[in-house]
């Protein structure tokens, strides 16, 4: 009989003692093994786009703490990147994207999307293969408004045009 994952069981209405545990930002500044890998790499975006590194970072907190779920190490800007947007990470400021002035600036070739998203797909496959049968794999996505706030400068100038071009104004 297949053992049900604790998190899935609770989401299906079961009561579990102890309850399943995970943290939304499992990989990050607090783990020494993450900090060591980040220091060697020097680039958050490189880590996101390297399936071997992203797999390792996803699994680090699960191995260390025995969490009931692993959260895939990636970034919400993976999809805008696949759409041809120039993704920029500035130390101390965070991510940004150039303003979109029309939908014409977005990549429409789905083969290019697949190529640019291939590292994310490979990371998902690697993590799934390395997780035990009791550990849930969680993903995430950026909502249109969240992504729209990253287009343009850190001020609201340029965001109105981006929102209009994306059809979310």
Locate the predicted segments by residue:
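N-terminal basic, low-complexity leaders that serve as flexible interaction/assembly modules and, when applicable
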Residues: 1-89
């Amino acid at each position: 009989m297949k053992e049900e994952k604790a998190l899935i069981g609770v989401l299906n209405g079961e009561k579990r003692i102890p309850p399943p545990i995970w943290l939304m930002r499992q990989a990050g500044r607090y783990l020494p093994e993450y900090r060591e890998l980040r220091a060697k790499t020097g680039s958050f975006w490189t880590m996101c786009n390297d399936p071997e590194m992203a797999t390792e970072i996803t699994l680090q907190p699960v191995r260390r703490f025995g969490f009931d779920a692993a959260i895939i190490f990636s970034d919400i800007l993976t999809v805008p990147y696949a759409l041809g947007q120039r993704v920029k990470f500035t130390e101390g400021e965070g991510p940004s994207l150039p303003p979109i002035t029309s939908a014409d600036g977005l990549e429409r070739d789905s083969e290019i999307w697949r190529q640019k998203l291939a590292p994310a797909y490979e990371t998902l496959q690697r993590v799934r293969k390395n997780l035990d049968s009791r550990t849930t794999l969680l993903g995430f996505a950026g909502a249109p408004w969240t992504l729209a706030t990253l287009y343009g400068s850190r001020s609201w100038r340029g965001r109105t045009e981006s929102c209009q071009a994306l059809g979310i104004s």
